[in-house]
Amino acid sequence: MLNSLKGLLSRKNDVPSPTVISLGQVWVDIMMDIDAIPQPGGFAVANHTMPSVGGSFRVMQAASRIGAATKHAGVIGNGPWASLIRKALNDNGIEHIGQDRIDADSGFRLVLNDSERKTFVATYGAESQGNENTFDCVEPGEGDVVHISANTLMDHSASGIDAFLHRTSSDPTTRGDDSAGACSTTACTLVPDRP
């Protein structure tokens, strides 16, 4: 009986596993723990500083950890922040299929944490410099999940999202069995009506 159950569990499933494809932006968060946000012109010393890869990376990392094939179709730059991003993607088994910018580094966010709230200061980089062709490399297969983050809808990369949705058809009766999901955050309130 045990061998029979083991045989059933070890059979390969004929249904292909879905791939998670993120069209989201990835950047580096530099977390700085401080006692208090300084007044304009003031000064603060960070008690702890920790760089980590952020943005859509966390969604991809979670998908990869549960065993889904995971791909990042966003733009990555060239420089120290981009190197940190590429290492994190590689370490987590996430394939980068998107464009590479050799003329700009990826961006970063300073995250000032005073234990009551977080204050963000962003500098955008290569991840925000897409265009209408940015996601031409993305061809979702049957059952694939496409992740779209609100941040990608806030800059030039939005035209790439628009072109992708028109190319792959947003009508589920003609699109097939792939799925698209948008990340719901407060950034959605900043998204313009059209790219």
Regions found by a protein language model. Give the residues of each.
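Ribokinase/PfkB-type carbohydrate-kinase core domain
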Residues: M1-V26, R86-R101, D114-P195
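Glycine-rich phosphate/adenosyl-contacting loop at the front of the ribokinase-like
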Residues: L2-V75, P80-K87, G143, G160
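Glycine-centered flexibility motif
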Residues: G41, G77, G107, G125-A126, ...
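Ser/Thr-centric signal marking residues that sit
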Residues: T70, S106, T119
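Beta-strand->loop->alpha-helix junctions that form or flank phosphate-binding loops
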Residues: A73-N78, I97-S106
